[in-house]
Protein backbone atom coordinates (compact mmCIF):
# COMPACT_ATOMS: atom_id res chain seq x y z
CA UNK A 1 0.00 0.00 0.00
CA UNK A 2 2.64 2.49 1.03
CA UNK A 3 4.75 1.40 -1.95
CA UNK A 4 2.48 3.47 -4.17
CA UNK A 5 3.09 6.57 -2.06
CA UNK A 6 6.83 5.85 -2.04
CA UNK A 7 6.93 5.37 -5.83
CA UNK A 8 4.97 8.55 -6.45
CA UNK A 9 7.18 10.54 -4.05
CA UNK A 10 10.37 9.26 -5.71
CA UNK A 11 8.94 10.01 -9.15
CA UNK A 12 8.22 13.61 -8.08
CA UNK A 13 11.64 13.92 -6.42
CA UNK A 14 10.25 14.57 -2.93
CA UNK A 15 12.16 11.75 -1.19
CA UNK A 16 15.49 10.02 -1.56
CA UNK A 17 14.96 6.72 -3.43
CA UNK A 18 17.47 4.70 -1.37
CA UNK A 19 16.63 5.81 2.18
CA UNK A 20 13.40 7.82 2.12
CA UNK A 21 12.43 9.76 5.22
CA UNK A 22 8.95 8.39 5.89
CA UNK A 23 7.33 11.66 6.96
CA UNK A 24 8.62 13.43 3.84
CA UNK A 25 6.17 11.47 1.72
CA UNK A 26 3.32 12.62 3.95
CA UNK A 27 3.98 16.36 3.71
CA UNK A 28 3.41 17.28 0.06
CA UNK A 29 0.15 17.04 -1.80
CA UNK A 30 -1.03 14.76 -3.40
CA UNK A 31 1.32 12.36 -1.59
CA UNK A 32 -0.01 13.58 1.78
CA UNK A 33 -3.51 12.39 0.92
CA UNK A 34 -2.32 8.98 -0.27
CA UNK A 35 0.11 8.63 2.66
CA UNK A 36 -2.64 9.40 5.19
CA UNK A 37 -5.14 7.09 3.55
CA UNK A 38 -2.76 4.14 3.22
CA UNK A 39 -1.22 4.61 6.67
CA UNK A 40 -4.72 4.71 8.20
CA UNK A 41 -5.45 1.40 6.48
CA UNK A 42 -2.14 -0.01 7.76
CA UNK A 43 -2.95 1.20 11.26
CA UNK A 44 -6.35 -0.48 11.17
CA UNK A 45 -4.80 -3.71 9.87
CA UNK A 46 -2.15 -3.53 12.60
CA UNK A 47 -4.89 -3.24 15.22
CA UNK A 48 -6.65 -6.22 13.68
CA UNK A 49 -3.46 -8.33 13.64
CA UNK A 50 -2.66 -7.38 17.24
CA UNK A 51 -6.16 -8.39 18.32
CA UNK A 52 -6.02 -11.66 16.36
CA UNK A 53 -2.68 -12.56 17.95
CA UNK A 54 -4.11 -11.72 21.37
CA UNK A 55 -7.13 -13.93 20.68
CA UNK A 56 -4.94 -16.79 19.45
CA UNK A 57 -2.74 -16.73 22.54
CA UNK A 58 -5.79 -16.41 24.81
CA UNK A 59 -7.49 -19.36 23.12
CA UNK A 60 -4.41 -21.58 23.21
CA UNK A 61 -3.70 -20.68 26.82
CA UNK A 62 -7.28 -20.58 28.14
CA UNK A 63 -6.80 -20.60 31.91
CA UNK A 64 -3.71 -22.78 32.26
CA UNK A 65 -1.20 -19.94 32.85
CA UNK A 66 -2.57 -16.89 34.64
CA UNK A 67 0.67 -14.90 34.26
CA UNK A 68 0.62 -15.45 30.50
CA UNK A 69 -3.05 -14.49 30.39
CA UNK A 70 -2.42 -11.17 32.19
CA UNK A 71 0.71 -10.41 30.19
CA UNK A 72 -1.09 -11.17 26.92
CA UNK A 73 -3.75 -8.58 27.81
CA UNK A 74 -1.10 -5.95 28.66
CA UNK A 75 0.67 -6.71 25.39
CA UNK A 76 -2.63 -6.22 23.56
CA UNK A 77 -2.79 -2.69 24.97
CA UNK A 78 0.81 -1.99 23.92
CA UNK A 79 0.07 -3.15 20.36
CA UNK A 80 -3.13 -1.11 20.12
CA UNK A 81 -1.29 1.93 21.50
CA UNK A 82 1.38 1.55 18.81
CA UNK A 83 -1.23 1.32 16.07
CA UNK A 84 -2.95 4.41 17.52
CA UNK A 85 0.36 6.24 17.24
CA UNK A 86 0.37 5.27 13.58
CA UNK A 87 -3.04 6.97 13.22
CA UNK A 88 -1.55 10.15 14.70
CA UNK A 89 1.40 10.04 12.30
CA UNK A 90 -0.96 9.55 9.38
CA UNK A 91 -3.32 12.38 10.20
CA UNK A 92 -1.01 15.06 11.61
CA UNK A 93 1.61 15.89 8.99
CA UNK A 94 5.03 16.91 10.20
CA UNK A 95 4.81 20.42 8.79
CA UNK A 96 1.30 21.00 10.17
CA UNK A 97 1.56 19.96 13.83
CA UNK A 98 5.09 18.74 14.54
CA UNK A 99 4.50 17.99 18.24
CA UNK A 100 1.56 15.67 17.61
CA UNK A 101 3.34 14.03 14.67
CA UNK A 102 6.48 13.31 16.72
CA UNK A 103 4.42 12.13 19.70
CA UNK A 104 2.58 9.74 17.39
CA UNK A 105 5.84 8.47 15.89
CA UNK A 106 7.36 7.97 19.35
CA UNK A 107 4.18 6.20 20.48
CA UNK A 108 4.12 4.03 17.35
CA UNK A 109 7.75 2.94 17.44
CA UNK A 110 8.09 2.88 21.25
CA UNK A 111 4.93 0.84 21.81
CA UNK A 112 5.87 -1.28 18.81
CA UNK A 113 9.16 -2.16 20.51
CA UNK A 114 7.36 -2.99 23.76
CA UNK A 115 4.88 -5.13 21.80
CA UNK A 116 7.70 -6.99 20.05
CA UNK A 117 9.45 -7.68 23.35
CA UNK A 118 6.16 -8.90 24.77
CA UNK A 119 5.54 -11.23 21.84
CA UNK A 120 9.04 -12.65 22.20
CA UNK A 121 8.41 -13.34 25.90
CA UNK A 122 5.03 -14.90 25.11
CA UNK A 123 6.67 -17.16 22.52
CA UNK A 124 9.27 -18.30 25.08
CA UNK A 125 6.55 -18.84 27.67
CA UNK A 126 4.42 -20.94 25.28
CA UNK A 127 7.35 -23.20 24.36
CA UNK A 128 7.21 -26.24 23.86
CA UNK A 129 3.44 -26.76 23.66
CA UNK A 130 2.34 -23.99 21.30
CA UNK A 131 5.51 -22.33 20.07
CA UNK A 132 8.84 -23.45 18.68
CA UNK A 133 12.08 -22.31 20.27
CA UNK A 134 13.41 -21.15 16.90
CA UNK A 135 10.60 -18.64 16.33
CA UNK A 136 10.91 -17.48 19.94
CA UNK A 137 14.63 -16.80 19.44
CA UNK A 138 14.00 -15.01 16.13
CA UNK A 139 11.36 -12.82 17.78
CA UNK A 140 13.70 -12.12 20.68
CA UNK A 141 16.59 -11.08 18.44
CA UNK A 142 14.35 -8.87 16.30
CA UNK A 143 12.80 -7.26 19.38
CA UNK A 144 16.17 -6.49 20.98
CA UNK A 145 17.50 -5.11 17.68
CA UNK A 146 14.39 -2.97 17.32
CA UNK A 147 14.74 -1.54 20.83
CA UNK A 148 18.44 -0.76 20.28
CA UNK A 149 17.73 0.93 16.95
CA UNK A 150 14.80 2.86 18.40
CA UNK A 151 17.01 4.34 21.11
CA UNK A 152 19.77 5.02 18.60
CA UNK A 153 17.39 6.88 16.29
CA UNK A 154 15.94 8.87 19.18
CA UNK A 155 19.35 9.62 20.69
CA UNK A 156 21.06 10.59 17.44
CA UNK A 157 18.10 12.73 16.37
CA UNK A 158 18.09 14.55 19.70
CA UNK A 159 21.88 15.01 19.64
CA UNK A 160 21.82 16.27 16.05
CA UNK A 161 19.06 18.79 16.81
CA UNK A 162 20.90 20.03 19.92
CA UNK A 163 24.19 20.37 18.03
CA UNK A 164 22.48 22.26 15.22
CA UNK A 165 20.73 24.63 17.65
CA UNK A 166 23.94 25.30 19.58
CA UNK A 167 25.50 26.61 16.35
CA UNK A 168 22.36 28.17 14.82
CA UNK A 169 20.05 29.05 17.75
CA UNK A 170 17.63 31.17 15.70
CA UNK A 171 17.01 28.72 12.83
CA UNK A 172 14.42 25.95 12.83
CA UNK A 173 15.68 22.38 12.78
CA UNK A 174 16.43 21.46 9.16
CA UNK A 175 14.41 18.73 7.55
CA UNK A 176 16.71 15.79 6.73
CA UNK A 177 15.54 15.25 3.18
CA UNK A 178 16.26 18.84 2.15
CA UNK A 179 19.93 18.55 3.10
CA UNK A 180 20.43 15.00 1.76
CA UNK A 181 21.00 13.56 5.23
CA UNK A 182 20.14 9.90 5.52
CA UNK A 183 18.11 8.96 8.63
CA UNK A 184 19.67 5.49 8.76
CA UNK A 185 18.79 4.46 12.34
CA UNK A 186 15.13 5.38 11.84
CA UNK A 187 15.03 3.45 8.58
CA UNK A 188 16.54 0.33 10.14
CA UNK A 189 14.20 0.62 13.13
CA UNK A 190 11.21 0.83 10.79
CA UNK A 191 12.33 -2.20 8.78
CA UNK A 192 13.12 -4.28 11.87
CA UNK A 193 9.63 -3.75 13.31
CA UNK A 194 7.99 -5.35 10.31
What residue ranges belong to the model's regions?
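Early transmembrane alpha-helices of polytopic membrane proteins
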Residues: 1-58, 71-85, 91-94, 103-124, ...
